[in-house]
Amino acid sequence: MKQIKKKLPIGIENFAKLQAEDFYYVDKTMLIKELLDNWAEVNLFTRPRRFGKTLNMSMLKAFFELNGDKNCFKGTRISREVYLCEQYMGKFPVIFISLKSISAQTYEKACDMAIQIVNGEARRFQYLLDSERLTEYDKDAFKSLLLPDMKESVLCLSLIHISEPTRPY
């Protein structure tokens, strides 16, 4: 019987794609349990380039994201943690911003690229503008993130303005 080899995920940083297309993968899903068991207000992931930081962040997003595809975790080690999966999987809005694609010769160009990244992520949460939980100030602040010509001063506060409306979750 001939054994079919899985493809190597060279350059793939999207956990859902990696799982859906059956790439070879070293199961690091217990990182999720480790983070929940050793909860900290801030977690800093330091590793050299090409060590899977973005893929791990994508895995965290896939796990926690509202209405995420739970099939991504079928057969993984974390799926055996039934209680943990019931409590946390697919229950939260997840803000996912990677700055690794910002490569510019000038500060202005880098700032423009950062604006586009934040703008794209804010669009994913546009539905929050319909929430009755948000004040008009919060809605106005959030709307400023949706403008393609966002000001640099708005960019500086963008993580606050994206995350504040998700707080009730």
Where are these regions (language model features)?
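Internal hydrophobic scaffold segments of catalytic domains
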Residues: 49-59, 97, 108-114, 169
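Glycine- and acidic
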Residues: 14-19, 40-46, 99-103, 141-152
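Short, compositionally biased low-complexity segments
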Residues: 2-8, 87-94, 130-137
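Accessory N-terminal region flanking or inserted into the helicase ATPase core
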Residues: 2, 109-159
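Walker A/P-loop-proximal flanking segment of P-loop NTPase domains
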Residues: 1-65, 70-81
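Charged/polar, solvent-exposed surface patches and flexible loops
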Residues: 17, 34-37, 62, 112, ...
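P-loop NTPase motor core
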Residues: 65, 69-127
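Single conserved hydrophobic/aromatic residue that forms the stacking wall/gate
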Residues: 160-169
